[in-house]
Design a protein with these regions (language model features):
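Gly/Pro/Ser/Thr-rich low-complexity, intrinsically disordered segments predominantly at protein N-termini
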Residues: 1-197
């Protein structure tokens, strides 16, 4: 057995001493799809479970069904939080005027009203702890965390709202069958239809 020739090995970029920036995220060649920037480090996404795909589609469709004309529901788009942080929420609700066209690759945190993360096994700590903290610090007013639960592995949605005084998220509800909330707009999503996706 022989080693792979050097010219066929993938050459990963060497990180700068102070970490990567948002400029790097958008200019480094050949990054894998859905690469995120967290605290100046590039984070590559592992293959996802079917649950992840189905939950994103169920929730995105539900959010779109009642979205007001001044807002848009987008999936898997980078959100610039600061110079060293550009995560990619699974779903975001953004101001419609922030959508500039089909070549757009990012949104600014100030344009995001809701960030949704569907927990994945490889990113559970980031989805539960790191990202919510960073979204709140960047001023995103609403956050949903979605996980599998029960014997049938159905989605459970934890809904959080950012307190202006604290700048942190507080849990406002946990939804097993239906998500029914009035912020950031009137939303009703039937989680029991999950198996249709």
């Amino acid at each position: 057995m022989t080693a792979e020739p050097a010219e066929h090995r993938r050459q990963w970029p060497v990180p700068p001493l102070d970490g990567y920036t948002m400029d790097d995220l958008f200019t480094l060649p050949d990054l894998p799809p859905h690469t995120e920037l967290i605290d100046g480090s590039l984070v590559f996404v592992s293959p996802q479970r079917y649950f992840h795909f189905a939950a994103i589609h169920l929730l995105a469709n539900g959010l779109r069904s009642t979205v007001p004309s001044g807002l848009k529901v987008v999936c898997e788009m980078t959100v610039v939080l600061d110079r060293r942080n550009g995560p990619e929420p699974d779903i975001s609700v953004v101001r419609a005027e922030a959508v500039t066209g089909p070549r757009q690759i990012r949104f600014e945190a100030a344009d995001v009203l809701l960030a949704v993360e569907v927990i994945s096994p490889d990113s559970e700590a980031r989805d539960r702890d790191t990202k919510p903290h960073k979204y709140a610090a960047a001023g995103i007013p609403h956050f949903w965390l979605v996980d599998m639960a029960g014997q049938d592995d159905h989605p459970v949605v934890q809904v959080y709202e950012r307190g202006e005084a604290t700048g942190t998220y507080a849990l406002t509800g946990i939804y097993h069958d239906h998500v029914k909330v009035s912020v950031p707009y009137d939303i009703l999503i039937d989680l029991t239809t999950f198996n249709e996706y």
